[in-house]
Amino acid sequence: LHVDAVGGALKLIVLAPGLKPEYSNSFSLSADLYHNFGRVQTNLLIEGFYTKLDDVFTLVQIGEDADGNFIMERRNASGATVKGFNFEGKIGIPNLFELQLGYTLQSSLYDRPVEWAENSDLPAQRKMFRTPDSYGYFTSTWNIAPRFRASLFGTYTGTMLVQHTFYNAQTDSMQDAETLTPDFFDMGLKLAYTFRLSTSVNLELSAGVKNIFNSYQKDLDFGPLKDAGYVYGPALPRLFFAG
């Protein structure tokens, strides 16, 4: 039983006859550099990676059962290749501040185009779904005072292709589509102060905001005919917190 539900119906997965195991071979090469500039400590990591997938699994919608549930068949595609570069860096002064960030550029392609909906006019697709070509993150901490600390953090997700099954009122039927999502930058801020109650007991009070720019999916499905799997981007809209 697939976890998604579309239009009030479930998605049931069956295995294709002769389904083979999926295998992968991965290679990577990296350089890790460290250097101090006085009190400032730095680190840079550069990595290249390459993964070849053989008989990669794909899900193809092949029809419906008597109860109106979607039947998805798990098949072997010809293969796929995932490759790219990863960059990570750190800079900081001990007991004062620290910044860490990373960024990845990658390509995720099937060897030959794959159809994910047999009864659809959509062309076969080489690009893997839900695999952005770029993504990154950063975290930083600044000790403003001996017991007062600020943290700034964030993640970046580039555009990606997402499958979407929606209700078409003109044809009175469910229709398959591919959506190119926007990119998202989800940034948050946290301030924390530590009170020393005794030599062995501390109390920390904190407050902040997550997803400061309210970078959030704007076209969520609603209603009984929604596609429960059509969700992408940050999990929460702007959120204030304290504790």
Q: What kind of region is each of these model predictions?
A:
Residues 19, 29-33, 87-91, 101, ...:
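Residues on the lipid-exposed face of transmembrane beta-strands in outer-membrane beta-barrel proteins
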Residues 12-17, 70-76, 118-127, 173-179, ...:
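Extracellular loop and loop/strand-boundary signature of outer-membrane beta-barrel proteins
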Residues 31-37, 44, 93-95, 107, ...:
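Outer-membrane beta-barrel proteins
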Residues 1-6, 56-64, 70, 106, ...:
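Outer-membrane beta-barrel translocator domains and adjoining extracellular loop/strand segments
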Residues 20-73, 81-83:
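Membrane-embedded beta-barrel scaffold of Gram-negative outer-membrane proteins
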